[in-house]
Amino acid sequence: YMFGLYYSDNKKPNFTEDYVLYVRPETTVAQVIDSLQTGAGVLRPRSIERCFEKMEVSAKMKPGRYVIEPSFPSIYVARMLVFGWQTPQNLVLSGTMRNKGRIAKKISTQMMVDSASVAQALDSADFLKGYGFTPENVFALILPDTYQMYWTASVEDIFDRLKKEYDAFWTPERDA
């Protein structure tokens, strides 16, 4: 009996669907289990519950964007949540980038950050000075592209990445 449970929890695939699970800081384990059952098609709910208890998911769960595949056993999903094994998100910045409200909305609909904090950063001379920009010329920092980053990235992480790509693009040869 014990080996059967071990096998069921640790080796046997427990999902029927590919599913992207979003965990916010305020998300509860009950919400995660409910979300997995609805979206990922859990085959053995008790297996998920046992693994979540064993790994203390309720106390240790990390926010993030987790891609669940049908081949995953319950224990792997529990470990993903406890250790924060996120799958990167594609942040797509394209189209018209000349309106701060639109930029803030575009970022916040794809990432965990809210549009108010992005808008605040776009208008903060002190914050932007660290990147060599001002609220007036910040549009130049944002190159239309697809940026792979973690869904939980902070506003600072996002701007660090935008600046890194900006610096990589604007080489002295291109700048001339």
Model-derived features: where do they sit?
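Conserved catalytic or metal-liganding residues and their short signature motifs at active sites
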Residues: 1-176
